[in-house]
Amino acid sequence: MIDVSIHYEIVTEDNIFSIKELCNDLMTYQKSKANIHPEFFDNMSFETRMIPSMKSSKENYIVAAIDDNQVVGYAYSTIAPKTTYSGGFATLQCDAFFDFDSVKTDDVGCLSQFFIKDNYRNTGIGTELFNMSMKWLKSFEEISDLFIFVSNGNDNALKFYINKGFKVSHQILDGFITVLRNR
């Protein structure tokens, strides 16, 4: 563990490129962990995941952890129509991410991306990013269904979210993604 003096900033759409490198690092990290179709990550990047997600969502929230003017972690959350989660994931085609009939409203909340540089893990940054994201998601009183999609092989992330109260719902893309839900 390193000695960190972290502060947190909301990343606006105008400043979105400040997390581009970390977003691409997330795709590389997920590929390194994957034991089911790691090649699926080959075409995933800031341009193919972050930008399209921001455009298709009704609301976006990005919070960055910053150490000495360097972004060392971020969390990206969305409020989007549930139909956004039908027919594909980034550059992949699949059935719906979840049973639409099980969702009470037309919109859902999602903790969509979450990444912390290796040297900054297990320092409390993840918990702070998670808590800030959940506070934002829960500020939408009409949204009762929250989802997190965890790539296969990322067991530490899966345990982290389960310890935060999310439950495994099901898998999609033949186990490539595990869907977690708040209820």
Q: What are the residue ranges of the model-derived segments?
A:
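Conserved beta-strand-loop-alpha-helix junction that forms the acyl-donor binding cleft
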Residues: 118-121, 132-133, 146-158, 174-183
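Conserved active-site alpha-helix within GNAT-family acetyltransferase domains
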Residues: 127, 139-142, 152-170
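Conserved N-terminal entry element of GNAT/NAT acetyltransferase domains
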Residues: 1-17, 21, 25-28
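A short helix-loop-beta-strand connector motif used in the catalytic cores of GNAT acetyltransferases and
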Residues: 49-63, 81-85, 110
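Conserved acyl-donor/pantetheine-binding loop and adjacent beta-alpha core of acyl/acetyltransferases
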Residues: 79-110
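Conserved GNAT acetyl-CoA-binding A-motif
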Residues: 108-109, 137-151
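Conserved GNAT-fold acetyl-CoA-binding loop/helix
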Residues: 28-50
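Conserved acetyl-CoA-binding loop-helix of GNAT-fold acetyltransferases
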Residues: 113-116, 122-135, 163
